[in-house]
Amino acid sequence: MRKITTSAYMPTEIEVENVSENVAKIIAYPFETGYAVTLAHPLRRLLYTSTVGYAPTAVKIDGVSHEFDSMRGMLEDVAIFIINLKGIRFKIKGDSKREVIEYNFTGPKEITGKDLNNDIVEIVNPDAYLATINEDADLKFSVVIEKGIGYVPSESIRDYVSSDYIALDAFFTPVIRAIYDIENVFVEDNPDYEKIIFTITTDGQVSAVDAFKNALEAMYQQMSVFKGIVDIDTGKSFTKQIPSGEHSKLFESIENLNLSARSFNCLEKADIKFVGEIVIMDESELKGIKNLGKKSLEEIKSVMEEIGYPIGNEEIKDKKEVLSKKIAELKKKAKDDK
């Protein structure tokens, strides 16, 4: 029998099983009815869209002008060669996000992924087939390898690659397959709780467990915007909610500074409504506020020091453009809502 509660049951168990080198099962339970699919579905989507991987984004082949061309001495035409190339999974060994790799093969030879290994890249599927060339062929080509997420069409890549390169559709995700099953599980003789069983397969660029961790982090980052919601009251009959983030104090009304009436009124008349607007000003700009005397200036400087944002704060100055834009948006929204 299900008991009446005022909060959802918190899952307490997680199991990780490495089925093979690139396959893992991740099991978590127990969840309230309906919670399992609510969490599992977006995680599955994020596994595909947010896991960082590597892919060939452009190729230049000596003697070839376009993807529908053919090459003497190569069994495959260029279109098939490109399809095979996109099926080879590269991994840059260093920290670089982009590398241009040059290859030169003389026939007769059957070229596979292992032949593309070098000091710069590792091929995680070395048995993948690329092309076959005969004794008359001399195959020279350059491949651009980039680091990214998700899928980027060739039209977007064509905008920035050299005209002598053929732009490729780039499939960055290293996650080959991500599925989940939901099963019922008992909690105190109640079978209505749920278990999530993820089965994740990658191409070897990253482990399945690391891919899952990455998806969790991506979900947390995306959802965190809703975590920091605060009220803003400017004293002008509007209250808005905005994400607070790392520097929530910056988006509070200047009323919260508890300044003297004279100091507050000077700022108010200068259309300064948020703490962040003061932070991004230097002392000379503050002095330029109409009717703001020396005593008020010292009061404002003292209060800003107390809340941890001294005038001329270098950390915030580096974010001035972003902060100014966000505050401008808040002001506009407040004005529109009047």
From Swiss-Prot:
SUPFAM superfamilies found in the cross-reference section: C-terminal domain of RNA polymerase alpha subunit (SSF47789), Insert subdomain of RNA polymerase alpha subunit (SSF56553), RBP11-like subunits of RNA polymerase (SSF55257)
Annotated EC: 2.7.7.6
Pfam families from the UniProt entry: RNA_pol_A_bac (PF01000), RNA_pol_A_CTD (PF03118), RNA_pol_L (PF01193)
Region (Alpha C-terminal domain (alpha-CTD)): 246-338
Transmembrane segments: none
GO MF annotations in UniProt: DNA binding; DNA-directed RNA polymerase activity; protein dimerization activity
Keywords: DNA-directed RNA polymerase, Nucleotidyltransferase, Transcription, Transferase
Top-rank taxon: Bacteria
Gene Ontology annotations of biological process type: DNA-templated transcription
InterPro entries the UniProt entry points to: DNA-dir_RNA_pol_insert, DNA-dir_RNA_pol_RpoA/D/Rpb3, DNA-dir_RpoA, RBP11-like, RNAP_asu_C, RNApol_insert_sf
GO cellular component, one term: DNA-directed RNA polymerase complex
Reactions it catalyzes: RNA(n) + a ribonucleoside 5'-triphosphate = RNA(n+1) + diphosphate
Chain intervals for the UniProt region annotation (Alpha N-terminal domain (alpha-NTD)): 1-230
Quaternary structure annotation from Swiss-Prot or TrEMBL: Homodimer. The RNAP catalytic core consists of 2 alpha, 1 beta, 1 beta' and 1 omega subunit. When a sigma factor is associated with the core the holoenzyme is formed, which can initiate transcription.
Entry comment, domain topic: The N-terminal domain is essential for RNAP assembly and basal transcription, whereas the C-terminal domain is involved in interaction with transcriptional regulators and with upstream promoter elements.
Family listed: Belongs to the RNA polymerase alpha chain family.
Protein function: DNA-dependent RNA polymerase catalyzes the transcription of DNA into RNA using the four ribonucleoside triphosphates as substrates.
Protein name: DNA-directed RNA polymerase subunit alpha
Natural source organism: Campylobacter hominis (strain ATCC BAA-381 / DSM 21671 / CCUG 45161 / LMG 19568 / NCTC 13146 / CH001A)
